[in-house]
A protein has these predicted regions:
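HIT superfamily nucleotide-processing domains
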Residues: 1-157
Length: 157
């Protein structure tokens, strides 16, 4: 299925331009036209699926993740200073299932197995989603609060 009002469907069908970097029969990866780092890419399903990854059929989601993995390896090889590529499945921007890939420039040493921690020093705690995802650690949470939150979440498992 394709939706005429979906820009990713238009791109997948070849009706809108993109700068492709990898593709197979079910997926297409292309450079973002709004990059916040060199090589920032988007991997989409060729068929239209809603953007919330965890509402997708397991086979569809697994296919997208494997396509993202293949694309990430291409990005890792394409940049001398990249040893890892980050993945986000936030589902905003376009209501079409997609993964965002971020080559992590400055991580080349990690590719050879020389793991090292990289800490941003960020300390902002988010009460609500602000349009972007941050992966830095914040202040240490109390074990009492964490235990209560874990108990609450387990009730829905």
């Amino acid at each position: 299925m394709h939706r005429a009002d979906c820009i990713f469907c238009q791109i997948a069908q070849g009706h809108s331009p993109c700068h492709p970097i990898w593709e197979d029969e079910r997926h297409l990866a292309f450079l973002s036209i709004f990059p916040n780092t060199k090589g920032f890419s988007v991997v989409i399903t060729r068929e239209h699926h809603g953007s919330y990854a965890f509402a997708a059929d397991e086979t569809v989601l697994a296919g997208l993740v494997l396509a993202a993995q293949k694309t990430a390896k291409v990005l890792d090889r394409a940049f001398d200073d990249v040893g890892r590529t980050g993945l986000i499945l936030e589902g905003f921007g376009v209501d079409h299932l997609h993964a965002k890939l971020f080559p992590m420039h400055g991580t080349a040493g990690l590719a050879s197995g020389q793991w090292q921690p990289i800490n941003s020093g960020g300390r902002k705690y988010f009460e609500k989603y602000e349009g972007y995802i941050s992966s830095y650690d914040c202040e240490r949470a109390s074990d009492v609060e964490l235990a209560a939150l874990a108990a609450h979440i387990r009730r829905f498992a």
